[in-house]
């Protein structure tokens, strides 16, 4: 939890192992008993952040099996936003430090992200097949746009100003206007 909070606030380059150790209440050298490197700590935080969101979306989609694709889209958006803002330190840190500085993200991080993107690609394909999205739209561009917009809400979302369910409806309307 401490590493996620520090990474959320400082990012990869500004967060040091010394800060993480101090936040946990141990010596820096003791961190190496649990993790081989800073990159391994970051990898764990990023994977947990993506997993929290992935689980939220899976639960939302499981609850809407058999419903119209547009309803499933709204549920997935709501699940993503609820998990994103419900596990803020992990999820925001995972967005902020996905690219580990100059080094490419580890394969485990890329694999988790690809699996999550595939969920959205399938959902977009459902929407296109149902006529809720124009078939001419490039699914990958739409997926990246939508995930970027949802993840970008970490910069401006305030629970006292926006309700997650209402926000999910608004995002859904932007992506797939009613009547399309």
Label each PLM-derived region with a short phrase.
Residues 2-40, 44:
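Helix-turn-helix
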Residues 2-9, 52, 56-63, 149-156:
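Solvent-exposed, amphipathic alpha-helical segments
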Residues 12-13, 133, 162:
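Conserved hydrophobic residue
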Residues 17, 39, 43, 47, ...:
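Short, structured helix-loop boundary elements
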Residues 44, 58-88, 142-146:
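Hydrophobic alpha-helical connector segments
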Residues 48-58, 86, 104-130, 139-144:
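Amphipathic alpha-helical packing segments from all-alpha helical-bundle domains
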Residues 82-86, 122, 126, 136, ...:
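Amphipathic C-terminal alpha-helical segment
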Residues 84-104, 121, 155:
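Amphipathic alpha-helical segments used for helix-helix packing
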């Amino acid at each position: 939890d401490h590493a996620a909070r520090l990474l959320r606030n400082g990012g990869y380059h500004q967060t040091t192992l010394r800060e993480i150790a101090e936040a946990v209440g141990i010596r820096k050298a003791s961190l190496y008993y649990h993790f081989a490197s800073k990159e391994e700590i970051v990898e764990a935080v990023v994977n947990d952040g993506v997993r929290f969101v992935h689980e939220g979306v899976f639960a939302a989609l499981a609850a809407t099996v058999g419903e119209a694709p547009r309803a499933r889209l709204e549920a997935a958006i709501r699940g993503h936003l609820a998990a994103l803002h419900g596990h803020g330190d992990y999820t925001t840190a995972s967005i902020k430090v996905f690219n580990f500085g100059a080094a490419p993200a580890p394969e485990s991080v890329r694999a988790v992200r690809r699996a999550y993107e595939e969920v959205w690609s399938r959902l977009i394909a459902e929407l296109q097949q149902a006529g809720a999205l124009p078939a001419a739209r490039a699914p990958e561009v739409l997926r990246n746009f939508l995930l970027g917009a949802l993840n970008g809400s970490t910069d401006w979302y305030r629970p006292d100003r926006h309700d997650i369910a209402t926000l999910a409806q608004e995002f859904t309307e932007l992506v797939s206007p009613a009547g399309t």
